[in-house]
Amino acid sequence: MKNQHILFGICGSFCNHAAVLKEFEKLCEENDVQAVDSENVFTCNTRFFQHEDFISRLEKASHKPVIHTIVEAEKVGPSNAYDIMIIAPMSATVAAKMVLGIYDHPVTLAAKAMLRNNRNIVFGIASNDGLSISAKNIFTLINLKHFFVIPFAQDAPFEKERSIVSKWNLLEKTADM
Protein backbone atom coordinates (compact mmCIF):
# COMPACT_ATOMS: atom_id res chain seq x y z
CA MET A 1 0.00 0.00 0.00
CA LYS A 2 1.57 3.26 -1.14
CA ASN A 3 0.68 6.89 -1.66
CA GLN A 4 -2.75 6.62 -0.04
CA HIS A 5 -4.45 9.23 2.12
CA ILE A 6 -5.50 7.16 5.13
CA LEU A 7 -7.70 8.17 8.03
CA PHE A 8 -6.80 5.88 10.91
CA GLY A 9 -9.29 5.62 13.79
CA ILE A 10 -8.08 4.24 17.10
CA CYS A 11 -10.51 3.08 19.77
CA GLY A 12 -10.42 0.92 22.85
CA SER A 13 -9.02 -2.36 23.43
CA PHE A 14 -6.00 -0.76 24.99
CA CYS A 15 -4.15 -4.07 25.22
CA ASN A 16 -3.98 -4.09 21.40
CA HIS A 17 -2.54 -0.61 21.02
CA ALA A 18 1.11 -1.68 20.88
CA ALA A 19 0.48 -4.09 17.99
CA VAL A 20 -1.72 -1.59 16.16
CA LEU A 21 0.85 1.17 16.67
CA LYS A 22 3.46 -0.93 14.82
CA GLU A 23 1.10 -1.25 11.86
CA PHE A 24 0.28 2.47 11.99
CA GLU A 25 3.98 3.35 11.91
CA LYS A 26 4.56 1.03 8.93
CA LEU A 27 1.69 2.64 7.00
CA CYS A 28 3.12 6.09 7.70
CA GLU A 29 6.35 5.20 5.91
CA GLU A 30 4.73 5.22 2.44
CA ASN A 31 1.34 6.86 2.95
CA ASP A 32 -0.20 10.06 4.22
CA VAL A 33 -1.85 8.96 7.47
CA GLN A 34 -4.04 11.00 9.81
CA ALA A 35 -4.92 9.55 13.23
CA VAL A 36 -8.31 10.15 14.81
CA ASP A 37 -8.69 8.92 18.38
CA SER A 38 -11.62 8.32 20.66
CA GLU A 39 -11.74 10.55 23.72
CA ASN A 40 -10.66 7.65 25.93
CA VAL A 41 -7.63 6.84 23.80
CA PHE A 42 -6.65 10.51 23.76
CA THR A 43 -7.01 11.05 27.53
CA CYS A 44 -6.70 7.79 29.47
CA ASN A 45 -3.54 6.44 31.02
CA THR A 46 -3.62 2.65 31.12
CA ARG A 47 -1.32 -0.14 32.19
CA PHE A 48 -0.34 -0.43 28.52
CA PHE A 49 0.46 3.21 27.68
CA GLN A 50 0.53 6.66 29.17
CA HIS A 51 -1.71 8.62 26.84
CA GLU A 52 0.93 11.32 26.24
CA ASP A 53 3.42 8.69 25.06
CA PHE A 54 0.91 7.01 22.77
CA ILE A 55 -0.24 10.28 21.20
CA SER A 56 3.36 11.41 20.80
CA ARG A 57 4.23 8.25 18.85
CA LEU A 58 1.22 8.68 16.57
CA GLU A 59 2.10 12.30 15.87
CA LYS A 60 5.79 11.54 15.36
CA ALA A 61 5.01 8.81 12.82
CA SER A 62 2.35 10.76 10.91
CA HIS A 63 3.80 14.27 11.31
CA LYS A 64 0.27 15.47 12.12
CA PRO A 65 -1.65 16.32 15.27
CA VAL A 66 -4.19 13.67 16.25
CA ILE A 67 -7.83 14.50 15.58
CA HIS A 68 -9.55 14.02 18.93
CA THR A 69 -12.67 16.18 19.05
CA ILE A 70 -16.07 16.10 17.39
CA VAL A 71 -15.39 19.55 15.91
CA GLU A 72 -12.19 18.34 14.22
CA ALA A 73 -13.77 15.07 13.05
CA GLU A 74 -16.71 16.91 11.48
CA LYS A 75 -14.33 18.45 8.94
CA VAL A 76 -13.49 15.02 7.47
CA GLY A 77 -16.63 14.93 5.32
CA PRO A 78 -16.42 18.30 3.58
CA SER A 79 -12.65 17.98 3.06
CA ASN A 80 -13.07 14.66 1.20
CA ALA A 81 -9.32 14.25 1.69
CA TYR A 82 -9.01 10.53 2.46
CA ASP A 83 -9.02 7.46 0.24
CA ILE A 84 -9.82 4.96 2.97
CA MET A 85 -10.41 4.72 6.71
CA ILE A 86 -8.96 2.08 8.98
CA ILE A 87 -10.38 1.63 12.47
CA ALA A 88 -8.07 -0.47 14.61
CA PRO A 89 -8.68 -1.58 17.16
CA MET A 90 -12.44 -1.24 16.95
CA SER A 91 -14.21 -2.08 20.18
CA ALA A 92 -17.58 -3.81 20.32
CA THR A 93 -19.04 -0.54 21.59
CA VAL A 94 -17.89 1.31 18.48
CA ALA A 95 -19.21 -1.52 16.28
CA ALA A 96 -22.61 -1.13 17.97
CA LYS A 97 -22.55 2.64 17.51
CA MET A 98 -21.76 2.27 13.81
CA VAL A 99 -24.55 -0.25 13.25
CA LEU A 100 -27.05 1.95 15.09
CA GLY A 101 -25.91 5.22 13.51
CA ILE A 102 -24.65 6.77 16.74
CA TYR A 103 -21.96 9.28 15.83
CA ASP A 104 -21.13 10.76 19.20
CA HIS A 105 -17.35 10.66 19.24
CA PRO A 106 -14.52 11.53 16.86
CA VAL A 107 -13.98 8.06 15.36
CA THR A 108 -17.65 7.33 14.69
CA LEU A 109 -18.28 10.81 13.28
CA ALA A 110 -15.22 10.52 11.02
CA ALA A 111 -16.46 7.11 9.85
CA LYS A 112 -19.87 8.58 9.04
CA ALA A 113 -18.10 11.24 6.97
CA MET A 114 -16.17 8.59 5.06
CA LEU A 115 -19.40 6.75 4.26
CA ARG A 116 -20.92 10.04 3.12
CA ASN A 117 -18.05 10.27 0.64
CA ASN A 118 -18.52 6.64 -0.49
CA ARG A 119 -15.18 5.57 0.95
CA ASN A 120 -14.34 2.17 2.38
CA ILE A 121 -13.76 1.46 6.05
CA VAL A 122 -11.49 -1.39 7.08
CA PHE A 123 -11.89 -2.39 10.71
CA GLY A 124 -10.05 -4.64 13.08
CA ILE A 125 -12.16 -5.93 15.92
CA ALA A 126 -10.95 -6.58 19.44
CA SER A 127 -13.61 -7.65 21.90
CA ASN A 128 -13.91 -10.00 24.85
CA ASP A 129 -17.53 -10.66 23.87
CA GLY A 130 -17.14 -10.72 20.09
CA LEU A 131 -18.60 -14.23 19.88
CA SER A 132 -21.32 -13.41 22.39
CA ILE A 133 -23.73 -10.50 22.69
CA SER A 134 -21.58 -8.23 20.47
CA ALA A 135 -21.43 -10.71 17.59
CA LYS A 136 -24.67 -9.38 16.11
CA ASN A 137 -23.23 -5.89 15.60
CA ILE A 138 -19.82 -7.07 14.40
CA PHE A 139 -21.32 -9.39 11.80
CA THR A 140 -23.84 -6.76 10.73
CA LEU A 141 -20.93 -4.41 9.97
CA ILE A 142 -19.19 -7.11 7.97
CA ASN A 143 -22.29 -7.33 5.76
CA LEU A 144 -22.68 -3.59 5.14
CA LYS A 145 -21.51 -1.85 2.00
CA HIS A 146 -18.12 -0.14 2.35
CA PHE A 147 -17.09 -2.16 5.45
CA PHE A 148 -14.26 -4.70 5.33
CA VAL A 149 -12.92 -6.64 8.29
CA ILE A 150 -9.33 -7.52 9.09
CA PRO A 151 -9.37 -11.32 9.60
CA PHE A 152 -9.84 -12.26 13.24
CA ALA A 153 -9.77 -15.30 15.48
CA GLN A 154 -10.24 -16.29 19.07
CA ASP A 155 -7.27 -14.97 21.00
CA ALA A 156 -7.59 -17.28 24.01
CA PRO A 157 -10.11 -20.00 23.13
CA PHE A 158 -9.80 -21.94 26.38
CA GLU A 159 -9.56 -19.01 28.79
CA LYS A 160 -11.89 -16.52 27.04
CA GLU A 161 -13.93 -18.51 24.56
CA ARG A 162 -15.98 -15.51 23.40
CA SER A 163 -13.01 -13.19 22.86
CA ILE A 164 -11.82 -12.29 19.35
CA VAL A 165 -8.98 -10.14 18.05
CA SER A 166 -8.06 -9.22 14.50
CA LYS A 167 -4.75 -10.39 13.11
CA TRP A 168 -2.96 -7.06 13.09
CA ASN A 169 -0.24 -8.30 10.75
CA LEU A 170 -2.97 -8.52 8.05
CA LEU A 171 -4.09 -4.91 8.50
CA GLU A 172 -2.20 -3.47 5.54
CA LYS A 173 -3.00 -6.39 3.25
CA THR A 174 -6.71 -6.05 4.06
CA ALA A 175 -6.68 -2.30 3.47
CA ASP A 176 -4.79 -2.59 0.17
CA MET A 177 -7.85 -3.25 -1.99
Per-range role (PLM):
Residues 1-121, 126-177:
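A cross-family phosphate/adenosyl-ligand binding-site feature
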